[in-house]
Regions:
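Aromatic-anchored segments of alpha-helical transmembrane domains
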Residues: 21-28, 83-95, 145-156
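Short juxtamembrane and helix-loop transition motifs at transmembrane-helix boundaries
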Residues: 35-48, 75-76, 101-108
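Canonical alpha-helical transmembrane segments
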Residues: 54-79, 122-128
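Short alpha-helical packing/oligomerization segments
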Residues: 87-127
Length: 166
């Protein structure tokens, strides 16, 4: 039983870190709610509305995830982070109609394809695992992947700037 408690503690710490990083990012995005890109088409206006809705929902969802993680309610924390991933993915859907499918064999194209296909799958899988109270470690890893991959991209960019200058 001590092993289960130890594993649970590590999952809780991981979820606290992921939820805190996401909450800080959500709070930093609040000014974007009020920015007007002056879209000229109805689809552009809808896309801006979805982005604003995503930014508005990000704060309570990530703060709820942080609360649940701190309170030790791991299933709810996993579900909240997964819902955040789904909401962000949904807000990106109009880009299919605005820009077309942007998948290609370049790094950017592969990244977009993996996100477009992978984000809803991992979020739904994590929600399912949390709902069933099974394999919470895997569910935690799944909801952490978008955050981890985002910060690895930032790190790679920073290293590139340090090596080659800006």
């Amino acid at each position: 039983m001590a092993t289960a408690n130890g594993t649970r503690r590590y999952l809780r710490i991981a979820l606290i870190v992921i939820a805190a990083v996401e909450a800080v990012g959500a709070l930093m995005g609040v000014p974007g709610i009020f920015y007007d890109f002056n879209p000229t088409t109805p689809l552009g206006k809808f896309a801006q509305w979805l982005t604003s809705a995503d930014l508005v929902l990000a704060v309570p969802i990530t703060l709820a995830a942080l609360y649940f993680a701190v309170a030790g309610r791991l299933r709810y924390a996993i579900a909240a982070i997964a819902i955040r991933v789904l909401v962000t993915w949904l807000s990106d859907l109009p880009s299919f109609w605005i820009h077309g499918i942007e998948w290609s064999l370049s790094y950017g194209g592969i990244t977009v394809a993996v996100y477009d296909i992978g984000a809803p799958l991992i979020a739904l899988a994590a929600i399912y695992l949390a709902w069933r109270n099974e394999r919470l470690g895997l569910a935690t890893l799944l909801v952490a992947l978008p955050t981890i991959l985002t910060w690895l991209g930032v790190l790679a960019f920073a290293i590139g700037v340090m090596i080659h200058g800006f």
